[in-house]
Every structure is written in C-alpha cells, then in structure tokens.
Amino acid sequence: MGVNETQLAQKVIQMGAFTSVFTLKPEQQKATLVLGQEETLLQTMEECSELVAACHQYRRTVLMKGQPTSKTPDEAITNLKEELVDAIICIKELIMILGIDYDELEKIEREKTDRTARRLGL
C-alpha cells in the first residue's frame, strides 16, 4: 500500500467517519490497511460475484420451485445469507480504504430511493 493510501486510511479512521452499519472492528480496519486499495477492490468484486450467484441459486431453488438445482431451499437461504455478509464486510472495507464519506452515501441513497418511489407512483 502506498504512503498516500496509508495516510488517507489513517486520517479517515481518526475522523471516526464510519458509524452505524458501516463500522468496522479495529482488527478489520487493520487488515484492510494491510491489504490496501487494490486487493480490497479485487476482494469486493469477487464477493459481489459470489453474491450474484447465490441470488440466482436462491431464485431458482426457492422462488421457482421445480427448477433442478444442487441445493435444498434451506441450503440456498444459508448460502445467500453467508454471501450477503461477505459482500457487506467487503463494502465496509472498501468505504474505509477509499475514504468515502458516509453522509454522501446516505444522500445518494435518499435520492435513489426517492426516484424509485416516484417512478412507482408511491
């Protein structure tokens, strides 16, 4: 990890910018700093692709009954939960290592949910 990445991550941690559901335990913060931006990005991509596969498996196994799959409904749900957690952890780490402001994320989230509500006439 480059000096700028380290300084940025340390500054972000000192600012206490990660509250709420995006709080990382100290050991997670340290591990993320050791891995650096590139490895954190790669790990996030991998975990998100595994989440996509788990969502697809859940859809076929649970929602589209009768589709041949290698998992039982309980296994599909358990796998989906595990992949959700893996992706959430990586997203938290990515937010930290890139120094993304949580308030900005909340603002974007509000804009997107408001837009969806308008489109649905809610």
Placement of each model-derived feature along the sequence:
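Flexible "arm" and connector segments at domain edges
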Residues: G2-L122
